[in-house]
């Protein structure tokens, strides 16, 4: 509830900031015309929290979807590109499967292949590790790091997974109650003397985020009526 996903929607232009600016290459996203916003989004790849695959389309058609919608590439070229993208995430050979036939980790990797279909300059990851088993989580973290280096893209990742996130990112922005409480390198974050950051990094049950909800009455008052 600190505004992480909202921030991503500001970057994509789905929301307009009431105050301040979101600048991409020095240009205010909120000031884009419809044509500029279309081109801005065309340069982006977004990996949604649960993959968001089209359930009625095969794996092949899911990955091919942005190519067919946003380019005029011939089908033969699209076929080769789909195979290359699936190979990049280790899933060449599953083209004919439906999303319902995939495990959770495989579905997330197919979604990642679709995300990189057009070699985006900006990558947005919304909770990419949510709901994954340890092996799938490690695979996705490895792929995110490798793809980012291969594409040389700017990547923004929203995540609660401290261990995996700090292992692959260059800069951390820590949000609490809609405000930035820390911005710096992973190493600086680990050494920071901040109650907010310390509780989050170490998973402590009590701290600035209290264990108990601030009830208006005492327990004794509730029990005695």
For the regions a language model picked out, list residue spans one by one:
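Catalytic Walker B motif of ABC-type/P-loop ATPase nucleotide-binding domains
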Residues: 123-126
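Helix-to-loop junction immediately C-terminal to a conserved catalytic motif
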Residues: 12
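Conserved ABC ATPase signature
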Residues: 98-102, 106
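Conserved ABC ATPase "signature" region
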Residues: 27-28, 75-93
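ABC ATPase NBD coupling module
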Residues: 29-45, 75, 189-192
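Conserved catalytic motifs of ABC-family nucleotide-binding domains
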Residues: 119
């Amino acid at each position: 509830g600190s505004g992480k996903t909202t921030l991503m929607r500001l970057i994509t232009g789905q929301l307009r900031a009431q105050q301040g600016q979101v600048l991409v290459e020095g240009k205010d996203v909120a000031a884009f015309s419809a044509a500029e916003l279309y081109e801005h989004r065309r340069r982006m790849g977004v990996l949604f929290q649960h993959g968001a695959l089209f359930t009625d389309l095969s794996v092949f058609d899911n990955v091919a979807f942005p190519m067919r919608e946003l380019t005029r590439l011939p089908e033969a070229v699209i076929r080769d590109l789909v195979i290359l993208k699936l190979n990049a995430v280790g899933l060449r050979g599953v083209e004919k499967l439906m999303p319902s036939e995939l495990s959770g980790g495989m579905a997330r990797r197919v979604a990642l292949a679709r995300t990189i279909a057009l070699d985006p300059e900006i990558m947005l990851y919304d909770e990419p590790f949510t709901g994954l088993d340890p092996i799938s989580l490690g695979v996705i973290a490895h792929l995110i790091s490798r793809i980012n280096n291969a594409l040389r893209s700017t990547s923004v990742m929203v995540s609660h997974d401290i261990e995996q996130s700090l292992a692959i990112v260059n800069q951390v922005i820590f949000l609490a109650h809609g405000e930035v409480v820390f911005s710096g390198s992973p190493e600086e974050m680990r050494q920071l003397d901040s109650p907010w950051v310390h509780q989050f990094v170490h998973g402590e049950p009590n701290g600035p985020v209290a264990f108990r909800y601030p009830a208006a009455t005492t327990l004794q008052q509730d029990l005695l009526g």
